[in-house]
């Protein structure tokens, strides 16, 4: 007879099935005794609050206080020692230990109920705060109830949920098992709240603009297409809210912002998710220099308020990392000057004509499109050779007009615009510019984009006639900016991939 063997994966599946069957049997027994999912327990305390308020109290002080609490949470660990047990409960604010004894509970409850509960079960506890012999703040339980029976076990304590894709697919398990993941998303919430407070304090008004648009605009990107049955028209998930926000400035809302989703039908990478969150804001009677000043102030404020310091550590995966200092003035360089700084063998004259710049790009093995103008080529050289070098906070200014169809031309040099992109950690974080408010110039640039689309550029913009009409009514001198919330959170949490800061990122369906 041949010997049969199983793989570790099969063994794990068998173990899981056996444990789930055992848990289902326990649930069936609980159902026979009543409702195993009650909803009448009300807590009055959170673990983190108890540690904050009573963490420095001595055992004698706690005994004198006799503080009664009602807490609820998930059983994360448990040590059964005959007639007494210790368990760790986890709630939204952290963890706290509870001490359960047979003699403090109704007769038979400890052995027949409590000892049969499992890790992952959710319980409600009432008891008194005390400090154990080892000095740990704990709750001496006088009453404990099962509130939710978990049918699946938690990830193993030491192995945890370490596979990146599994963490994204089962974010609920990731949040249960990984404290760092929970901290990341708490920080994300604080970042968004901090931005709102900062802008509200400066008299910006938060607004909402359409997520489905007849004409996608405001950025160069490939949109998602859907169909509106009642109107029988194709519509696009928005790639940016920009053109609608500027319509509001025309209408008299002179400081507006929106924090919401954008959708771009593009590739997925450590920096890109097809559905992502952006802050866009617009200020009348301001220019791109005002925006750079405002951005410095906002990021410095967020770092100090959320992280407690203007200096943060940041490292891309596999790299040693660096200290990023928001407390110092941010570097400001024109695009051409940045190319010259990081490419000592390139001269200003090398970038003066399309022919010369193309020769530089070919020498650097940069792919170009035949329809590109000089501005496109200079931008491609910058993106390939400079962008990843911009580790400390840096504004790159004077973007070519050819790649900035919505930005105002510079008064001294109409070939470039009053535009900047903000880089940090070698990655783009923000894009802002003095807005183009010349309706005739805007119409010409839209037409140039249409020509580029006809030449094969799928990311070129559509012609938005209604937006041109809005400009014809008069847009005051305005500056506007977009900041990627996901990338900002990556920076503040030292996360290596955008999937770590989006609760439910896009993934290919499992077969």
Curated annotation (Swiss-Prot):
Protein EC: 6.1.1.6
Cysteine disulfide partners in this protein: none
NCBIfam families: lysS_bact, PRK00484.1
Cellular compartment(s): Cytoplasm
Species of provenance: Aeromonas hydrophila subsp. hydrophila (strain ATCC 7966 / DSM 30187 / BCRC 13018 / CCUG 14551 / JCM 1027 / KCTC 2358 / NCIMB 9240 / NCTC 8049)
Gene Ontology biological process terms, A to Z: lysyl-tRNA aminoacylation
Gene Ontology terms for molecular function: ATP binding; lysine-tRNA ligase activity; magnesium ion binding; tRNA binding
Gene that specifies this protein: lysS
Keyword Protein biosynthesis attached: yes
Keywords: Aminoacyl-tRNA synthetase, ATP-binding, Cytoplasm, Ligase, Magnesium, Metal-binding, Nucleotide-binding, Protein biosynthesis
Protein name in the entry: Lysine--tRNA ligase
Catalytic activity: tRNA(Lys) + L-lysine + ATP = L-lysyl-tRNA(Lys) + AMP + diphosphate
Top enzyme class: ligase
């Amino acid at each position: 007879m041949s010997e049969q063997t199983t793989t570790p994966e099969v063994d794990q599946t068998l173990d899981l099935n056996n444990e789930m069957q055992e848990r289902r049997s326990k649930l069936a027994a609980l159902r026979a005794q009543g409702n195993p999912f009650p909803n009448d327990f009300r807590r009055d305390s959170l673990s983190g609050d108890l540690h904050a308020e009573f963490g420095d109290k001595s055992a004698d002080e706690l005994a004198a206080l006799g503080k009664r609490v009602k807490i609820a949470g998930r059983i994360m660990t448990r040590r059964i020692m005959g007639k007494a047990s210790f368990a760790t409960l986890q709630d939204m604010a952290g963890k706290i230990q509870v001490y359960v004894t047979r003699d403090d509970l109704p007769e038979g409850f400890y052995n027949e109920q409590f000892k049969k509960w499992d890790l992952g079960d959710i319980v409600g506890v009432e008891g008194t705060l005390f400090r154990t012999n080892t000095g740990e703040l704990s709750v001496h339980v006088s009453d404990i109830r099962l509130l939710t029976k978990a049918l699946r076990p938690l990830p193993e304590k030491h192995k945890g949920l370490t596979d990146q894709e599994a963490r994204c697919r089962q974010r609920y398990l990731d949040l249960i098992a990984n404290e760092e993941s929970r901290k990341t998303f708490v920080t994300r919430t604080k970042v968004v709240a901090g931005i709102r407070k900062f802008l509200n304090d400066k008299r910006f008004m938060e607004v909402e603009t359409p997520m489905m648009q007849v004409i996608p605009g405001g950025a160069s990107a490939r949109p998602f297409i859907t169909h509106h049955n009642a109107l029988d028209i194709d519509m696009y998930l928005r790639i940016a809210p920009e053109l609608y926000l500027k319509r509001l400035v025309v209408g008299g809302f002179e400081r507006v912002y929106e924090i919401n989703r954008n959708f771009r039908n593009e590739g997925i990478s450590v920096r890109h998710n097809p559905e992502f969150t952006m802050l866009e804001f617009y200020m009348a009677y301001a220019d791109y220099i005002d925006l750079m000043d405002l951005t410095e102030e906002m990021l410095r404020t967020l770092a100090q308020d959320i992280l407690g310091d203007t200096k943060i550590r940041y490292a891309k995966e596999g790299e040693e990392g660096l200290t990023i200092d928001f407390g110092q003035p941010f570097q400001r360089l024109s695009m051409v000057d940045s190319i010259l700084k990081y490419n000592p063998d390139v001269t200003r004259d090398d970038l003066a004509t399309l022919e010369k710049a193309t020769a530089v790009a070919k020498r650097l093995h940069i792919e170009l499109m035949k329809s590109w103008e000089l501005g496109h080529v200079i931008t491609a050289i910058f993106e390939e050779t400079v962008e990843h070098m911009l580790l400390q906070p840096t504004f790159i200014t004077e973007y070519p007009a050819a790649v900035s169809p919505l930005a105002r031309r510079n008064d001294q040099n109409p070939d470039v615009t009053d535009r900047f992109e903000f880089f940090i950690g070698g990655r783009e974080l923000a894009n802002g510019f003095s807005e183009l408010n010349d309706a005739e110039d805007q119409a010409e640039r839209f037409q140039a984009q249409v020509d580029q689309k006809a030449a094969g550029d799928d990311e070129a913009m559509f012609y938005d006639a209604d937006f041109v009409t809005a400009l014809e009514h008069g847009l005051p001198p305005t500056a506007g900016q977009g900041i990627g919330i996901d990338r900002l959170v990556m920076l503040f949490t030292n996360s290596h991939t955008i999937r770590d800061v989006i609760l439910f990122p896009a993934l290919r369906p499992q077969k």
